[in-house]
Amino acid sequence: MAENGGRAGKSSGSGTGKGAVSAEQVIAGFNRLRQEQRGLASKAAELEMELNEHSLVIDTLKEVDETRKCYRMVGGVLVERTVKEVLPALENNKEQIQKIIETLTQQLQAKGKELNEFREKHNIRLMGEDEKPAAKENSEGAGAKASSAGVLVS
């Protein structure tokens, strides 16, 4: 995908007008948006797992004596602390992770809207996608959409 994006970027400066966008450029832009969306979803899933781990550790440490020794990884170094020192830091980290997940979820929704708008603007259909919804859209807005050729993305 990165190779296609590189070639599409080079061909855009070679002499085509700004109004005309080739099918390769549309596909490269669409794939770039999909990749960004996947990256956001992946990061959100990773943080969800980390949040679950924090919750598990916090629940476990709440049942333990506050003076008991525990170990915490700080900057790649294992540090010996007490439960009383570690628990507030873990709870703070958990809150921060929750805020980041909320932000990522909002970004993911915005990216999804942007991707759908891009699909509609360039009449992009994915391989394996049903033709029935597309046929219904064409019958309703035949004047605007009949003139533009669709782009098929695998």
Curated annotation (Swiss-Prot):
GO terms for biological process: protein folding. It is found in: Nucleus; Cytoplasm; Mitochondrion. It comes from Bos taurus. Residues 1-18 have a biased composition (Gly residues). SUPFAM superfamilies: Prefoldin. Heterohexamer of two PFD-alpha type and four PFD-beta type subunits. Component of the PAQosome complex which is responsible for the biogenesis of several protein complexes and which consists of R2TP complex members RUVBL1, RUVBL2, RPAP3 and PIH1D1, URI complex members PFDN2, PFDN6, PDRG1, UXT and URI1 as well as ASDURF, POLR2E and DNAAF10/WDR92. Interacts with URI1; the interaction is phosphorylation-dependent and occurs in a growth-dependent manner. This is Prefoldin subunit 2. It comes from the Eukaryota. Belongs to the prefoldin subunit beta family. One of its GO terms (cellular component) is mitochondrion. Residues 140-154 have a biased composition (Low complexity). Its main location: nucleus. GO terms for molecular function: protein folding chaperone; unfolded protein binding. Keywords: Chaperone, Cytoplasm, Mitochondrion, Nucleus. Residues 124-139 have a biased composition (Basic and acidic residues). Residues 1-20, 124-154 are annotated as: Disordered. InterPro entries: PFD2, PFD_beta-like, Prefoldin. Binds specifically to cytosolic chaperonin (c-CPN) and transfers target proteins to it. Binds to nascent polypeptide chain and promotes folding in an environment in which there are many competing pathways for nonnative proteins.
